[in-house]
From Swiss-Prot:
Component of the ubiquinol-cytochrome c oxidoreductase, a multisubunit transmembrane complex that is part of the mitochondrial electron transport chain which drives oxidative phosphorylation. Component of the ubiquinol-cytochrome c oxidoreductase (cytochrome b-c1 complex, complex III, CIII), a multisubunit enzyme composed of 10 subunits. The complex is composed of 3 respiratory subunits cytochrome b (COB), cytochrome c1 (CYT1) and Rieske protein (RIP1), 2 core protein subunits COR1 and QCR2, and 5 low-molecular weight protein subunits QCR6, QCR7, QCR8, QCR9 and QCR10. Residues 62-262 are mitochondrial intermembrane. One of its GO terms (molecular function) is heme binding. Belongs to the cytochrome c family. Present with 39900 molecules/cell in log phase SD medium. This is Cytochrome c1, heme protein, mitochondrial. Heme c binds at C101, C104, H105, M225. One of its GO terms (cellular component) is mitochondrion. It holds the Pfam family Cytochrom_C1. Residues 88-241 form the Cytochrome c domain. One of its GO terms (biological process) is cellular respiration. Residues 131-168 are annotated as: Disordered.
Length: 309
């Protein structure tokens, strides 16, 4: 009897010791986990506070006076997923560029041949290119020669180099307009707003440097380019009224096409791709349901032959 009591006492002692050890380990593990969670929450809070503070500084710095007034969103006819450029507007926009913008700005990345079939016929573009002279190979004596333009040539700029452009514009460099729509935040909305956003007089208290003009959509509000579009400044070939907004819309559409001449073909190809992939997807569903499902779910039963007696 005494031995039985001793065994029971020993078992209880061991079980209590094991329980206390396990409880202590669990307690330590819980405290460690709690510390890690607390540290993670604190780090996340510090990171969030830092980001919010930096964002507040950026928001204070990004004022309309420094970064320009935000251009409103306009309903451009080519913005939809299935919409294409208004090619009549591209033709009118080229006319505005040639008669107004080409005096200062270039289109170095646009070749004459890209206009064929988009806004002009082959003969029209060929005649326009031949109005300009390009450098040709020198003659036998090494003297430089000139030749009429060809469809493969690029539209020439108004100045031979950057120094000449700055000298003619009081030190300001007119940007190339080939990619201007893609190079400016807001794209077409910004270009249209900039062209039509010149007020008659700058706001009271705004001091402009000599030779500058005020435009709220330009960063800083001071721009070297003066207002260039006025009503009836261009006589459109198709008889469209040449209002300031109409000319700005047309030349913006033309510049958007210059920056993205593959726009229409890209959307056309995208539509074809969606149709083909959708058809293949439906075909795969049919194959899965009516052809592959039976193969995938079938079962083979093997009945071993009975041994012969």
């Amino acid at each position: 009897m005494f031995s039985n009591l001793s065994k029971r006492w020993a078992q209880r002692t061991l079980s209590k010791s094991f329980y206390s050890t396990a409880t202590g380990a669990a307690s330590k593990s819980g405290k460690l986990t709690q510390k890690l969670v607390t540290a993670g929450v604190a780090a996340a809070g510090i990171t969030a506070s830092t980001l919010l503070y930096a964002d507040s500084l950026t928001a204070e710095a990004m004022t309309a006076a420094e970064h320009g007034l935000h251009a409103p969103a306009y309903a451009w006819s080519h913005n939809g997923p299935f919409e294409t450029f208004d090619h009549a507007s591209i033709r009118r926009g080229y006319q505005v560029y040639r008669e107004v913008c080409a005096a200062c700005h270039s289109l170095d990345r646009v070749a004459w041949r890209t206009l064929v079939g988009v806004s002009h016929t082959n003969e029209e573009v060929r005649n326009m290119a031949e109005e300009f002279e390009y450098d040709d190979e020198p003659d036998e004596q090494g003297n430089p020669k000139k030749r009429p333009g060809k469809l493969s040539d690029y539209i020439p700029g108004p100045y031979p180099n950057e120094q000449a452009a700055r000298a003619a514009n009081q030190g300001a460099l007119p940007p190339d307009l080939s990619l201007i729509v893609k190079a400016r935040h807001g794209g077409c909305d910004y270009i249209f707003s900039l062209l039509t956003g010149y007020p008659d007089e700058p706001p009271a208290g705004v001091a402009l440097p000599p030779g500058s003009n005020y435009n709220p959509y330009f960063p800083g509000g001071s721009i070297a380019m003066a207002r260039v579009l006025f009503d009836d400044m261009v006589e459109y070939e198709d008889g469209t009224p040449a209002t300031t907004s109409q000319m700005a819309k047309d030349v913006t559409t033309f510049l958007n096409w210059c920056a993205e001449p593959e726009h229409d073909e890209r959307k056309r190809l995208g539509l074809k791709t969606v149709i083909i992939l959708s058809s293949l997807y439906l075909l795969s569903i049919w194959v899965k349901k009516f052809k592959w499902a039976g193969i995938k779910t079938r079962k083979f039963v093997f009945n071993p032959p009975k041994p012969r007696k």
